[in-house]
UniProtKB/Swiss-Prot annotation:
Assembly and binders: Component of the EKC/KEOPS complex composed of at least BUD32, CGI121, GON7, KAE1 and PCC1; the whole complex dimerizes.
Any one cellular-component term (Gene Ontology): chromosome, telomeric region
Family designation: Belongs to the GON7 family.
The protein's name in its UniProt record: EKC/KEOPS complex subunit GON7
Keywords: Activator, Chromosome, Nucleus, Telomere, Transcription, Transcription regulation, tRNA processing
Length: 123
C-alpha cells in the first residue's frame, strides 16, 4: 500500500513534507494527540462523545483493512501537521512580540534623545 503524504509551503519560503512512518505507533491509531477535547475540558468533567471508533480490521482480526490503515495514517499525519503549524504560530507570535518590544524601546530612546525624561506621568 502506498503511504499518504502531505506538502506544506508558505509565502515565506518554508516548505515541509509529511509522511507516516511504517510501524510507528503514532500512525497505527485513530486517537490523535492533537484532536478531541483538551485535558482541561476532560478534567472539568466533560465526556468525549466524539471519540473516534477503532480502525476496522479484517474478518479474522489479524490486521487492519485498507481503509482502517488509511484512517490511522491520516490521524498521525493530522497530528504532525497540527504540531508543526502550532509551532509556526508560536514563532510568529514571538516574532510579533519581539517587534513590538523593539518598537517600544526605540520610541523610549527617541523620546529621551528629544529631551524627555521618560516620566510623562509625573506631575
Amino acid at each position: 500500500m502506498k503511504l499518504p503524504v502531505a506538502q506544506y509551503s508558505a509565502p515565506d519560503g518554508v516548505e515541509k513534507s509529511f509522511a507516516p512512518i511504517r510501524d510507528d505507533p503514532r500512525y497505527m491509531t485513530t486517537e490523535g494527540r492533537t484532536t478531541g477535547p483538551s485535558d482541561h475540558v476532560l478534567n472539568a468533567g466533560q465526556i468525549d462523545r466524539d471519540k473516534p471508533s477503532e480502525p476496522e480490521r479484517t474478518k479474522d482480526g489479524s490486521q487492519l483493512t485498507y481503509l482502517g490503515q488509511l484512517r490511522t495514517q491520516l490521524t498521525g499525519l493530522q497530528d504532525d501537521i497540527n504540531e508543526f503549524l502550532t509551532g509556526r504560530m508560536e514563532l510568529a507570535k514571538n516574532k510579533k512580540k519581539a517587534g513590538a518590544d523593539e518598537k517600544r524601546i526605540q520610541e523610549e530612546i527617541n523620546q529621551l534623545l528629544d529631551g524627555g525624561d521618560g516620566d510623562e506621568d509625573a506631575v
